[in-house]
Amino acid sequence: MKLRNTVATALGAFALVLALPGSALSATGDFTYKYVTGLGHEERVTLHDPHSGKCINLYAVGDDDVPAGYGPHNRTDTSVTVYRGSSCTGDQWRLRAHGNPATDQLEVRSVRFDAPNS
């Protein structure tokens, strides 16, 4: 009976850990960029608390067959690498955490955020 209670407690604790929010794997804050729609309108997209450590192809510009986004602004708590190509390929630049907006000449299709500092 003691073993059964120990196993049940361990499984319950494991399930609780899995249910915790994934904020430990995300940057905290906002990352924004701009792009021009097919109708010629400038739009701004915001990623709120984006995932860290994995490549993110950006909405509306993450395909090499469409015009790139531009003017990225990293207001998260981690540095980010922005890529001119999709799937985190091509020319790349680093933007600091809580940085100033980049110039509109800086094109972006995909990004990868650093892991947050503990």
Spans of features found by a protein language model:
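Compact beta-sheet-dominated domain cores in extracellular/mature segments
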Residues: K2-S118
